[in-house]
Amino acid sequence: FHFEETVLGIEETANGIVLETSEQEISCDSGIFALNLHPQLAYLDKKIQRNLDQTIAVDPYLQTSVPNVFAIGDCISVMNEPVAETFYAPLVNNAVRTGLVVANNLEEKTHRFIGSLRTMGTKVGDYYLASTGLTEMEGLFFPQTLASVIVRQPAPPLQHGTEILGKLIYDKVTQRVLGAQLCSKNNCLEKINTLALSIQD
């Protein structure tokens, strides 16, 4: 890992890539870039209240502090279902879901946004990675007594792949599942949706 260095250029070579930073050149097989999005809301009227993280504050119907003005998607923080706390989750599924809620509330506020589990999946190299609900590290910020368990699921017989490695995060007192992460060379992205359903009440 190389922190606090600005990437100046990336050059593809026969053996991988050369990453030029403000401090050095790094030869490697591949690179993974983690980018963090944040809403650019400087243009907003000052009457519209914001949260501490500068996202737009909304009520359960996604209406802002100004009547008949709603906000959706990457501009808002959403409720985290398992712990009833808000968090910023710039995901396309949250944008679509919040947009649908607002569309239903334009004439009359009748649909509440139930929150998000931040369910996501991707493929990095040969591995599929998926997550829903709380991670173990995020659990440090919440009052529940959390525990985790590692689970291994063999590959289905007709799929000649590898096992699925998973981690379940749960409330130690109530035994309620609060989060899950999966990793496998097999496509496990659909399985995270099943785990997300188990977290929802």
Predicted features along the sequence, with ranges:
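A conserved short coil-to-beta-strand element within the FAD-binding core of flavoproteins
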Residues: 3-15
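FAD-site-proximal beta/loop scaffold in flavoenzymes
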Residues: 25-101
